[in-house]
UniProtKB/Swiss-Prot annotation:
Family: Belongs to the imidazoleglycerol-phosphate dehydratase family.
Species assigned in the record: Methanosarcina mazei (strain ATCC BAA-159 / DSM 3647 / Goe1 / Go1 / JCM 11833 / OCM 88) (Methanosarcina frisia)
Name under which the protein is recorded: Imidazoleglycerol-phosphate dehydratase
Catalytic activity line of the entry: D-erythro-1-(imidazol-4-yl)glycerol 3-phosphate = 3-(imidazol-4-yl)-2-oxopropyl phosphate + H2O
Listed GO biological process terms: L-histidine biosynthetic process
Name of the gene: hisB
GO cellular component: cytoplasm
Biological or metabolic pathway of the protein: Amino-acid biosynthesis; L-histidine biosynthesis; L-histidine from 5-phospho-alpha-D-ribose 1-diphosphate: step 6/9
A Pfam family hit: IGPD
Keywords, alphabetical: Amino-acid biosynthesis, Cytoplasm, Histidine biosynthesis, Lyase
Enzyme Commission code(s) on record: 4.2.1.19
Amino acid sequence: MRISKISRKTKETDIQLEINLDGKGTADVSTGIGFFDHMLSSFARHAEFDLKVRAEGDLYVDEHHLIEDTGIVLGKALAEALGDMAGIARFGEARIPMDEALAEVALDVGGRSYLVMKADFIAPQVGQFSTQLVKHFFETVASNAKITIHASVYGDNDHHKIEALFKAFAYAMKRAVKIEGKEVKSTKGTL
């Protein structure tokens, strides 16, 4: 089974995360940031990954450390659950609308970390979630999962734009990690 359980404890955060890439899309998420819980739950549901997250942090400072460290742990868990990546489709893409917003994500689960994101937000925050942390979260996931992500979104409502991005990421990941055979999808023979 493609499962991972990762913990990370620092002076700023304490995070436990479990993921099953062959799950049913169940989510049990508690970070103390309602909008972030909603985004992670949406990601799990639409990727059809089972995801459990327990995260505490120095929210009295701000949400940066908690969101960043959750991205670190999620990225590491994705990498661990994928193992040697033999048989996976490797590439995934999705276009997801949410009312007036449209998000596009294309990714390569190929062992190389990179993020290109085109996203502008109007408000500084959605709930307790700083909109400037959207890009940083995806950078952190990409870096730790060793995946390349190209993402873009447009629209008028920041909630819709961010949610469409998380859902597009979910569908792209679902497609990229799908088992299609036994071989590694690389001319090098390894990822």
